[in-house]
A protein has these predicted regions:
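Intrinsically disordered, low-complexity, mixed-charge
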Residues: 1-93
Length: 93
């Protein structure tokens, strides 16, 4: 079994009101990713993603593109920690 990696993502640009969180939830289910995603008051979307290195890399690639209606101007990716068993959409913070 491969070791889990965890990354914190912050997407900026046109990322709210374009189904970014729901798209990420669906992509997480497809990739076997756990963690969470939420809108932030500053207009960005923040996520914490955990899974195999390949799955997390694929999720980061998806987040750089986002759903069709999104325009991701920048994506900040940093190491994170925690242990997650599902993927959830959280409330705006």
């Amino acid at each position: 079994m491969s070791e889990k990696v965890t990354r914190r993502l912050v997407a900026r640009g046109r990322v709210q009101g374009v189904w970014f969180r729901e798209g990420m939830r669906q992509e997480a289910a497809r990739l076997g990713i756990t963690g969470w995603v939420r809108n932030r008051m500053d207009g960005s979307v923040e996520a914490l993603v955990q899974g195999s290195a390949d799955s997390v890399e694929a999720m980061v690639a998806w987040a750089r593109r986002g759903p069709e209606a999104a325009h991701v101007a920048s994506l900040e990716v940093t190491d994170a920690s925690g242990d997650y068993f599902s993927f959830e959409k959280r409330h705006t913070e």
